[in-house]
Amino acid sequence: MLRALKNSDTVRNLLADINSVGEFTDLYEHEKMLADAVRVETYRKGIARLIRPGDVVVDLGTGTGVLSLFAAQQQPKRVYAIDHSPVIDLARAIAEHNKLHDRIEFLQVNSRDLRLDEPVDVILHEQIGDELFDENMVANIIDLRDRLLKPGGRIVPGRFALYLEPVQLTDAGRVPFVWENLVPGLDYSFLRDHPLAAPYTEDGYHHRWLEGADAERLLCQPEPVLTVDLAEISGIEDLPRRIPVRRRVTTPGRCDGLLVYFEAIFDQEVRFDSCPLWDRTPSWGNKLFRAPARDCQEGDVVEYEVSFGDHTRVDTWRVEFA
């Protein structure tokens, strides 16, 4: 009963609202986002390409207003900058200081309660969580899209890909399972399937936060396990719940698990991703789904199945290796 209640749309939305207000009234969180050069510059380029003079824009979750400011520089008719936290007062002051406030209307409101007198040409947002869906992006965008977006309107960014990639960690970054530990003179291997260990290997045990420097290399050519187009999807229930994956190793190494990251796609030329192995987006973190260490040679096949209890909650995701 409790599990079903947690997975209901109403409760999911309420929990997401509570979490986001708490997190994004912390100025440090906004400082991290503003300091993320890849994030800021990609959004600036995408907005310059996709927002046109005369557009009506709604900026969902404006925070300190940086996306609304970029949008205002494109000579729109109006930008509605909305946020349900009081940080919007800071955004308003920043806009006034930068003399861009005349094109922006700041509204402290939950997006589901937003009512406008005109339809919008563009939904601008950064509702992207570390595991892509965990800031309730799909539900929030679809609600605005279905109520306010003009036919043929644009969602910026509108397409995404989720990756769970076989990865080798650095020796310093790898934490072996307890049964893999080689302690001089002691044997822990019997704990692998021991019933006494079972209660400690549930829920979030098989995934952990990964420091960016801990990832050494990917073992396969990256391929998304799923993609989503916010202009087309009717709800998060459209996304697959179970995804079998079969990957061929292109770079020999030790498979220590699966690295979780996402790609945000503005158009064919403007995109970014959160993989820690190249242009770093430090304001997003990465999870690792752990696996017993396995040495892989070029041409080997790594097979696994990814299942999603609730796409917005990584603690309900599971990975089973063949």
What are these regions (language model features)?
Residues L2-L60, T64-S307, H311-A322:
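Class I SAM-binding transferase module
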